[in-house]
Amino acid sequence: MASSTMALSSTAFAGKAVNVPSSLFGEARVTMRKTAAKAKPAASSGSPWYGPDRVLYLGPLSGEPPSYLTGEFPGDYGWDTAGLSADPETFAKNRELEVIHSRWAMLGALGCVFPELLARNGVKFGEAVWFKAGSQIFSEGGLDYLGNPSLIHAQSILAIWACQVVLMGAIEGYRVAGGPLGEVVDPLYPGGTFDPLGLADDPEAFADVKVKELKNGRLAMFSMFGFFVQAIVTGKGPLENLADHLADPVNNNAWAYATNFVPGK
């Protein structure tokens, strides 16, 4: 009796075959091609952050959310006055951009504050202010990572630029492609080796973690914007600006600087 073969063909399983009893298909040869599924919504039935009864942007004072914002995805508070999420493809793209920018902003905000915090507590490692640190590469001695010459000693801005392009490009390509074998279904939440703490093991808890990530990420993006403005206006790091404000809140605040700010000075 001849046997039938069902060949599962995909980027992850290319070349593998699964034998199927002939009683199911007779003499037929069935070929099935596996494609990456779209990311599933993170709706959580018991969470206040999802579904039609979720928390909205103004609480009980919120108006009726747009029909296309159904509470399926994390961070949906029913607010879209500009209609940016009306088109499903644009909505999916913007969701991905927001999550990626949120993660970079959280890392960036920590990187802006932590070196300055260490320097203010006596740790010596060169320039601690985030927007001044990179310029040390143009100094005669170059740039020592963490102020330690035994770590990475950089002297060429072109070499750093090339490393950034190659390394970050490779990481982003790895993410978009779903890993080396294309086995990752959702590039935003790949799981597996990218989740060593097992945060995604419990679907209910994972749905809430996604909301927390976006909340903190949105705050981090606003923080980074504030750090940029502070750097342009005051020429100081975020912690030094905070210390100045606490020491003299009347003369060191956004209003005082806005009314006295002269570009280029």
Swiss-Prot record:
Assembly description: The LHC complex consists of chlorophyll a-b binding proteins.
Any one GO MF annotation of this record: metal ion binding
Pfam families for this protein: Chloroa_b-bind
Residues where chlorophyll a 1 binds: W79, S85, E98, R218
Positions bound to chlorophyll a 4: N216
Name of the protein: Chlorophyll a-b binding protein M9, chloroplastic
Post-translational modification comment from the UniProt entry: Photoregulated by reversible phosphorylation of its threonine residues.
UniProt source species: Zea mays
Binding sites annotated in the UniProt record for chlorophyll a 5: K212, Q230
Keywords assigned by UniProt, alphabetized: Acetylation, Chlorophyll, Chloroplast, Chromophore, Magnesium, Membrane, Metal-binding, Phosphoprotein, Photosynthesis, Photosystem I, Photosystem II, Plastid, Thylakoid, Transit peptide, Transmembrane, Transmembrane helix
Annotated residues for binding of chlorophyll a 6: H245, A254
